[in-house]
Amino acid sequence: MTEYKLVIVGGGGVGKSALTIQLIQNHFIDEYDPTIEDSYRKQVSIDDETCLLDILDTAGQEEYSAMRDQYMRTGQGFLCVYSITSRSSYDEIASFREQILRVKDKDRVPLILVGNKADLDHERQVSVNEGQELAKGFNCPFMESSAKSRINVEEAFYSLVREIRKELKGDQSSGKAQKKKKQCLIL
């Protein structure tokens, strides 16, 4: 059975834990209890393939930023989450992505952009169009979700697994070409 290491990142209070617990335990946690780091595992079937999701729910607070490099190194795919009710959480997403790319030392990594708390449309500070434009700039899928209403919860995680699969297939088919490119000649 294939195992996928997913990391969920974003600012504090955007609903990372709520999304993860809704996926794993099928219930919504209403109270906000800042996460330092939690790990969850769930066996699922995605596109007729049984696989194991190893999900790392991370701290959004800045005081835990030193821990980020470590979990970014081990993650295969990243759910970048902001709250549609928080302009600042949206503005932070680019720096999370930049840190992921720097740590992974790649130009592109499997990533999904998620605008959470879609059930709070009356408190919206970030438009759907802004989310779509940011995702287009990142060259990644985008969706809005609601952990509370269970909207696009599974879809977000499953789409990320599909992105990882695409990346793995791309690495296999172009692996030989990439190895040939990395040559050094000293005269």
UniProtKB/Swiss-Prot annotation:
Disulfide bonds: none annotated. One of its GO terms (biological process) is response to bacterium. Keywords: Cell membrane, GTP-binding, Hydrolase, Lipoprotein, Membrane, Methylation, Nucleotide-binding, Prenylation. A motif (Effector region) lies at residues 32-40. A lipid is attached at C184 (S-geranylgeranyl cysteine). It is an enzyme of class 3 (hydrolase). The modification Cysteine methyl ester is found at C184. It comes from Dictyostelium discoideum (Social amoeba). GO terms for molecular function: filamin binding; G protein activity; GDP binding; GTP binding; GTPase activity; mitogen-activated protein kinase binding; protein kinase B binding; protein kinase inhibitor activity. This is Ras-like protein rasD. GTP binds at residues 10-17, 57-61, 116-119. It is found in: Cell membrane. The gene is rasD. The keyword Metal-binding does not apply.
